[in-house]
Amino acid sequence: MQNPNNLIWIDLEMTGLEPERDVIIEMATIVTDSELNVLAEGPVIAIHQSDETLAGMDEWNTRTHGQSGLTQRVRESRIDTATAEAQTIAFLEQWVPKGKSPICGNSIGQDRRFLYKYMPALEAYFHYRYLDVSTLKILAGMWAPQVKDSFQKTATHQALDDIRESIAELKHYRQHFLKA
């Protein structure tokens, strides 16, 4: 059910960090309420890319996405970028009105750069604000290192897992770092 207070969490996996030469290869979304309770998980989409594009990945991306099985899922996928964008928007429309949720995640500015270039309709679905868990991680590292160090991520670099970890990390900071 649509609620303007729901939050949209998104994560992208890309072939690299530069939107001018790299592309999106996987995306996932989760919608939570304002208390960070998961309401729905959106589609997890491997986006088809050519073998030539995949061969252009650097060593870190080649190893990481190869070991996780993502590279093979991308090769086998029949879903292009436009279809992935449309499927994700259709999911979000069920839960959050356009322009209401900030874009939520970890280092989410990087994801938004790719959305702006490759999925402008999806990028425009978000409010202009960011809910970036990385900000709290940086602040906790400076002001309360024991709080930062007490949260361990598995770092699978798979989009849905990364979102789940971002939500769990924000819950951790809410409990141990943010004081009402």
From Swiss-Prot:
It comes from the Bacteria. CDD domains: Orn (cd06135). It is found in: Cytoplasm. Pfam families: RNase_T (PF00929). GO terms for biological process: DNA metabolic process. Keywords: Cytoplasm, Exonuclease, Hydrolase, Nuclease. Its EC number is 3.1.15.-. The active site is at Y128. Its main location: cytoplasm. Residues 7-170 form the Exonuclease domain. One of its GO terms (cellular component) is cytoplasm. GO terms for molecular function: 3'-5'-RNA exonuclease activity; nucleic acid binding. The keyword Amino-acid biosynthesis does not apply. It is an enzyme of class 3 (hydrolase). Belongs to the oligoribonuclease family. 3'-to-5' exoribonuclease specific for small oligoribonucleotides. This is Oligoribonuclease. It comes from Ectopseudomonas mendocina (strain ymp) (Pseudomonas mendocina).
